[in-house]
Amino acid sequence: MGDNAILPPVSGVNWKQNLFVIWLSQFLAMVGFGCCMPFIPLLLKENLHIDDENLRGVYVSIYYLAAMVSLCIATAVWGMLADRFGRKLMLLRASYAAALFYPLLALAPNFWVLASIRFVCSFFSGTVNPAQTLLIATTPHEKHGFVLGVLSTATSSGNMLGYLLGGMIVHYFGYTEAFFTCGGIYLASALLVQFFAKDDFNVKLVKKRREKSKYKFKEVATPAVLWLLVLFLFFGVANRLVQPYMALLVETIHGFKGAAFYTGIVSAASSAGGFLAGLCIGWLCDRLAPRKLLLPILIAGAAFTGAMALSRNVEMLILTRFLAAFAVSGIQPVLQLMLTKITRPELRGTYFGWSGSINTAGGIICSFLGGGVVWLSGVRGVYLTSALILVLMIPVMLPTVLAMKKEYTVPADATGKDLKEAK
């Protein structure tokens, strides 16, 4: 695959301007997301009067299962459609859908309506994958690591502000107001993309190219791609396993009174760690082979995630969450960049859709796994399990790296000529 998978001509879009616009849109989207999502376990208690901790743990798992199943199916579909109809269109679809459906969650009269709305919302929303695809498509090859790292800071910093803002809104006004704020911020993000983001996607030209180039499945799903998807699956389980239970962990350590406020602070610390990780990883990935960064990141992520389970007070939890996020937030950009090294640019939306769906499939697994772990060993057991899964990713790296060395895509210039030959 590698020798034939050359890069297309350099995009005519101003990549720096596009990076700024897409970064800002994703920052706003994550502010909106952070305003409401961390507080779902507390919403179940406050609005729907589900008081039992174990029962709430099961309901939280069902809620996230509905979201993950929907998103797992949708991400691959939207990724393929992005390669056919354009990346900007997919980002707009996700942003406007989120603006419509997230406020409806606060109006759900019971848990099953809540889960149903979340299922529909997840199918049509999800801005991270289309934002990554649009940005990669309009950025020079040698800047891919930089832009993916910078874009990840939008997620972290947006979540950080969103968690703080959401915690304050919930504390002073209530859950309904937080969810409606989320919808309004997503709408602002959608309008920003609508009027300022650029995509030089040509539907007619792409259609002609697709008619000329018919890919067999084994040419697309190469050994290196499949091994990378295994790593995405493991990461999806490890990363998503802990996300729904932060509020429960804070409540376990601190008590219910003030739990919403401290959940916002702990989540903000997580976002601060992710923000710094994005800057560091983006800089390093354009200077070092991304596969060389993965091992130390996995070791640090496992160590600090396990330390979270041992926290005895909120202060220790804030510190360990910051350090864990700093390590773990670097994993996905590294894996995405590894994927761009061995894949065809004209099918990148499809590949990113696959990775997103597989990552989300990890979320489906942890929806079952998380509820069972909480039921059997309490919320602290969830964080120890996540650390173990990160450790298990280490032996999977070896066959992945060996396969990548055989399939590495040699960068090409705007004429399609091999840069090594040009030099």
Regions found by a protein language model. Give the residues of each.
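Juxtamembrane intracellular "pre-TM" segments in multi-pass secondary transporters
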Residues: G2-K16, D199-L228, G416-K423
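Hydrophobic core of transmembrane alpha-helices in multi-pass small-molecule transporters
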Residues: F27, F101, W112-G126, M316-G330
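Short amphipathic helix-loop junctions that connect adjacent transmembrane helices
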Residues: F39-G57, Y245-F261
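Residue-level signature of mid-helix packing/kink "hotspots" within the transmembrane helices
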Residues: A67-A76, G126, N159-M160, S271-L279, ...
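Conserved MFS/SLC helix-loop-helix module at the cytosolic interface between two early adjacent transmembrane helices
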Residues: C72-L105, P109, C285-R291
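Structural signature of the two symmetry-related core transmembrane helices
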Residues: L89-L104, G183, K292-A307, A387
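Cytoplasmic helix-loop-helix junction between adjacent transmembrane helices
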Residues: I117-S156, M338
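A membrane-interface helix-boundary motif in multi-pass transporters
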Residues: H171-G184, G372-L390
